[in-house]
Curated annotation (Swiss-Prot):
Keywords: ATP-binding, DNA replication, DNA-binding, Early protein, Helicase, Host nucleus, Hydrolase, Isomerase, Isopeptide bond, Nucleotide-binding, Phosphoprotein, Ubl conjugation
Keyword flag Nucleotide-binding: yes
Source species: Human papillomavirus 20
Name of the protein: Replication protein E1
Name of the gene: E1
Residue numbers carrying Phosphoserine: S81, S89
Transmembrane parts of this sequence: none
Family of the protein in this entry: Belongs to the papillomaviridae E1 protein family.
């Protein structure tokens, strides 16, 4: 019978539990093999002793040094190539620079960070290059010392900041900073007539030859050489930019562009002007030509510019009045162009209130011109305006155009005469007709020659849109439409009658004035409109029914120019009853010119 499953009594417990394992030869061999391969002491599983790093740190340091050295060599090959040395001189390729690996090894031994080591190494390289430059003598470079010139080349090539080296050498040679004599131009394309140049390591023979070669380019030359530095002040006959100046000097002196410092001189610095002036009188400098104006103004006693008095506004107003400059921009620009010849313009440019003087000048000129216009009759005004027209034309072109438009010339002359003389209810002429018939061209040409004003109904929302009528002898409203006719029929009847009206002007109280001669152009024949019947007796109309003729080359068939109107008024002067001014002109009576400045008649110009 089989043994029962499950637990047995306590008495049979010892038989069920295996107390000692059975051993065999195979088991013993595997156990021994396992024990030999994985033998360990459990008591020494954790090692609490201090670890020794060994040479891993030194290995890492050597790897960082190697990488830094490779990066440095790549940068040197990139920025200090043999091609750059060959451009300066072929002899420089045979010159070996002083080794600096020794200092690099010391730096590597003292530093433990690759980044700090590289930065410190580069800083030390720059400082060592600057410190190793030998002191310059105060005597010029002797002839034949080609080795010294070559040394200057190598020193400049070794410098990472060649401009700083040149500035330091310049100050050591001349005792004054280069920036103390010059003002800076950032752009290479900015033109200037005067340039200051400092050239490093110029051969003495080339320096002497440049004194003669530069005379064909410059009005004034100032050259001085001390040790390896040569200083030039060149006043060119024409404005040049920095690139053009460098190209000229590199070809003339056989130098590289890196050897040149160039900036314009300071023009309003007395100390800088005295440096050039005293240097020109010394024996060590070469000068050719008259002193520039900016130097003479600040150094020579009794110079014409130093004798100029303070700015005189009345002289500026007189100049603008004589040249008919009314716009502020024209006055400012044209008067500034007079600065080299006019002492008052120089004083104005040196003043801090230039804009205020320009505004006051423009205002005063407008006041004088308006007063002069009001004093003149229509005959005098027309005579003065046509005398300003240069050239000759023929009045027949205007007469032919009127006949082409089927306008009776006699009737037009009668209406024009009444308008110019401001006859009540006859001082307004309307030119109407289809589009492209030459209405605007005809009236605009007349307004242009008589210096009239043009009014635009687009400004009718402003209560000052009629203000130009108080400042002219003849006015024009071009392309009158229905809204404008309604406005004229409502508000401008008294003005068209030739009576005094109250005209609102900006920045002043309303003034009492009469409307000047008025020209109108429109596509609407107001005489055919019943709604504007009150304007029929106040406006004289002429119709232009035919299209404006053009030549095959797209030029007008009829020349409506200032010269044509000049001939028109001259030819029909008596018919228009404009005889007063012409009679005075034929009598040869002299007229005194208007003077608005405080200058006396006997004062020198």
């Amino acid at each position: 019978m089989a043994d029962p499953k499950g637990s047995t009594s306590k008495d049979g417990l010892d038989d069920w539990c295996i107390v000692e394992a059975e051993c065999s030869d195979v088991d013993n061999d595997l156990e021994e093999l396992f024990d030999r391969d994985t033998d360990s002491d459990i008591s020494e599983l954790l090692d609490d002793n201090d670890l020794e790093q060994g040479n891993s740190r030194e290995l890492f340091h050597q790897q960082e040094c190697k990488d830094s050295e490779e990066q440095l060599q790549k940068l040197k090959r990139k920025y200090i190539s043999p091609k750059a040395i060959a451009q300066l001189s072929p002899r420089l390729e045979s010159i070996s620079l002083s080794p600096q690996q020794k200092s690099k090894r010391r730096l590597f031994a003292e530093q433990d960070s690759g980044l700090e080591l590289t930065l410190t190494n580069e800083a030390e390289d720059v400082s060592s290059e600057v410190e190793e430059v030998p002191a310059l003598d105060s005597q010029p470079v002797a002839e034949g010392h080609l080795g010294t010139v070559d040394i200057h080349y190598t020193e400049l090539l070794r410098a990472s900041n060649h401009k700083a080296i040149l500035l330091a050498k310049f100050k050591e040679a001349f005792g004054i900073g280069f920036n103390d004599l010059t003002r800076q131009f950032k752009s290479y394309k900015t033109c200037c007539n005067d340039w200051v140049l400092s050239v490093y390591a110029v051969h003495e023979d080339l320096l002497e030859s440049s004194k003669q070669l530069l005379q064909q380019h410059c009005d004034y030359i100032w050259i001085r050489g001390i040790a390896a530095m040569s200083l030039f002040l060149l006043c060119f006959k024409a404005g040049k930019n920095r690139g053009t100046v460098h190209k000229l000097m590199t070809s003339m002196l056989n130098v590289h562009e890196k050897q040149i410092l160039s900036e314009p001189p300071k023009l309003r610095n007395v100390a800088a002007a005295l440096f050039w002036y005293k240097g020109a009188m010394g024996s060590g400098a070469f000068s050719h030509g008259p002193y520039p104006n900016w130097m003479a103004q600040q150094t020579i006693v009794g110079h014409q510019s130093t004798e100029a008095s303070a700015f005189d506004l009345s002289e500026m107003i007189q100049w603008a009045f004589d040249h008919n400059y009314l716009d502020e921009a024209d006055i400012a620009f044209q008067y500034a162009k007079l600065a080299p010849e006019n002492s008052n313009a120089v004083a104005w440019l040196a003043h801090n209130n230039q804009a205020r003087f320009v505004r006051e000048c423009a205002s005063m000129v407008r006041f004088y011109k308006k007063g002069q216009m009001k004093e003149m009759s229509m005959s005098e005004w027309i005579y003065a305006r046509i005398n300003e027209v240069e050239g000759e034309g023929h009045w027949s072109s205007i007469a032919k155009f009127l006949r082409y438009q089927q306008v009776n010339v006699i009737m037009f002359l009668a209406a024009l005469k009444d308008m110019l003389h401001s006859v009540p209810k006859h001082n307004c002429i309307l030119i109407h007709g289809p589009p492209n018939t030459g209405k605007s061209a005809f009236t605009m040409s007349l307004i242009h020659v008589l210096k009239g004003r043009v009014l635009s109904f687009v400004n009718s929302k402003s209560q000052f849109w009629l203000q130009p009528m108080s400042e002219t002898k003849i006015a024009l409203i071009d392309d009158v439409t229905d809204p404008c006719w309604v406005y004229m029929d409502t508000y401008l009847r008294n003005g068209l009658d030739g009576h005094y009206v109250s005209l609102d002007c900006k920045h002043k109280a309303p003034i009492q004035t009469k409307f000047p001669a008025l020209l109108l152009t429109s596509n609407i024949n107001v005489h055919n409109e019943v709604n504007y019947r009150y304007l029929h007796s106040r406006i004289k109309g002429f119709e232009f029914p035919n299209p404006f003729p053009m030549k095959p080359d797209n030029t007008p068939e009829f020349e409506l120019t200032d010269q044509s109107w000049k001939s028109f008024f001259t030819r029909l002067w008596k018919q228009l009853e404009l005889s007063d001014q012409e009679d005075e002109g034929e009598n040869g009576e002299s007229q005194q010119a208007f003077q608005c400045s405080a200058r006396s008649a006997n004062e020198h110009l």
